[in-house]
């Protein structure tokens, strides 16, 4: 369901399937850059329940308004966020320590911010989701990508 307007547009993204594809793309388990993942999805594709899926194109998104437009036009986007030692319960809490980076799906938005889905399961945030306020946007993402 599209969390912006309640329509039936499918916003479910299997981040684990994309990450797991790197086994054939890279010989080591040091993570994967967005550019490598998107290149793989465009040229090799990712197996889904509905068959092999390939993206046609991808591009970076750099602003709140551009991200909103990309979600409406293309569906979920992917973004890289810093990971703090408080990240299992909340994105960031005062006094938290930086531990690394992580990819998430940005699946929708409302008047207060973006709805984020993580691949860590239902124990993370609020049943696997969290809400990122617009005022925290510029200090949150390393990069954001949209794809068609």
Predicted regions located by residue number:
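Catalytic-core signature of thiol
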Residues: 1-148
């Amino acid at each position: 369901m599209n969390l912006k307007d309640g329509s039936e547009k499918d916003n479910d993204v299997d981040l684990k399937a994309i990450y797991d594809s790197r086994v054939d793309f890279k010989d080591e388990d040091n993570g994967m850059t967005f550019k490598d993942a998107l290149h793989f999805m465009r040229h090799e594709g990712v197996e889904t329940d509905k068959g092999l899926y390939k993206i046609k194109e991808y591009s970076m998104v750099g602003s709140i308004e551009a991200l909103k437009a990309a979600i409406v036009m293309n569906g979920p986007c992917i973004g890289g966020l810093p990971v703090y030692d408080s990240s299992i319960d909340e994105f960031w809490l005062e006094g938290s320590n930086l531990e690394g980076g992580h990819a998430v799906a940005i699946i929708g938005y409302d008047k207060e911010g973006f709805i984020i889905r993580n691949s860590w399961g239902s124990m993370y945030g609020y049943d696997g989701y969290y809400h990122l306020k617009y005022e925290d946007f510029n200090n949150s993402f390393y990069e954001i990508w949209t794809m068609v």
